[in-house]
């Protein structure tokens, strides 16, 4: 039987090396120009433009024009979750890049996945949410419990602002390096914003790495363990 959506087109779009590099570069949640993405993929501007057109037509990317420039980003969080899952499959299959980056340990510890925290610390936070019963599975998917709402409110996040919106407040995202889930959705994004605002961590320039200070990591762990 051949029921359901046809996945070949999407698989073919992701399966090209240059397009895969472009998609991976956008996993940090930032919008980039065609020129910047051409550099990332090590292709000419004309070739990058052709790839970007295909990715936009395939609904994997969205484009926004500002003046003379066009900025490309991942279409939505579903695309980011798909890419993160594929990275996990590639990692388990041993499909690794030949050159190990000095940033790899830092990437595995804490990084941006679209707009939320991933890596060891992201998974740790999600597991604390589960242990403290901050989450439950309802008819609309993963939701904050009353205890979870009180917790995020204590961090300075208004839970009411995340109810009834188009984007899910909470959702699972499979972490490629930890092979377990971290917290995505608008609450996951708001938590990462608060981590920055509280001065616990900063994002490295031109990287997905989220670098916690020693005191920031201690405070982050403490607030999750209270």
Residue ranges and their predicted role:
Residues 34-61:
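Canonical helix-turn-helix DNA-binding module
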Residues 1-5, 28, 81-137, 158-206:
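Amphipathic alpha-helical dimerization/coiled-coil segments
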Residues 64-92, 144, 148-151, 216:
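Basic, amphipathic "hinge/linker" alpha-helix immediately C-terminal to the N-terminal HTH DNA-binding motif
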Residues 13-19, 76-77, 107, 119:
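Short helix-coil-helix linker/hinge
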Residues 125-126, 135-151:
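Non-catalytic interaction/regulatory modules that flank or connect domains
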Residues 56-66, 73, 138-139, 204-205:
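Beta-hairpin "wing" of winged helix-turn-helix
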Residues 5-44, 70-72, 112-113:
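N-terminal helix-turn-helix DNA-binding core of bacterial DNA-binding proteins
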Residues 31, 54, 59-60, 71, ...:
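Short hinge/loop at the helix->beta-strand junction immediately C-terminal to the helix-turn-helix recognition helix
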């Amino acid at each position: 039987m051949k029921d359901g959506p046809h996945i070949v087109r999407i698989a073919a779009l992701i399966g090209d090396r240059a397009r895969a590099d472009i998609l991976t570069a956008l996993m940090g949640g930032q919008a980039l120009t065609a020129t910047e993405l051409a550099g990332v993929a090590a292709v000419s501007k004309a070739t990058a433009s052709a790839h970007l057109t295909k990715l936009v037509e395939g609904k994997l990317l969205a484009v926004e024009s500002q003046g003379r420039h066009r900025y490309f980003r991942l279409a939505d969080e579903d695309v980011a979750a798909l890419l993160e899952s594929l990275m996990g499959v590639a990692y388990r299959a041993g499909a690794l890049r030949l050159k190990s980056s000095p940033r790899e340990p830092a990437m595995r510890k804490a990084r941006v996945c679209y707009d939320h925290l991933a890596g060891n610390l992201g998974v740790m936070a999600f597991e604390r949410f589960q242990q403290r019963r901050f989450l439950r599975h309802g008819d609309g998917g993963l939701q904050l419990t009353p205890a979870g709402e009180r917790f995020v409110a204590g961090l300075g996040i208004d839970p009411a602002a995340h109810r009834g919106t188009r984007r899910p407040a909470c959702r699972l995202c499979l972490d490629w390096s930890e092979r377990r889930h971290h917290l995505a959705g608008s609450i996951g994004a708001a938590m990462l914003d608060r981590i920055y605002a509280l001065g616990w961590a900063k994002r490295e320039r031109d990287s997905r790495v989220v670098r916690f200070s020693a005191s920031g990591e201690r405070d982050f762990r403490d607030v999750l363990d209270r």
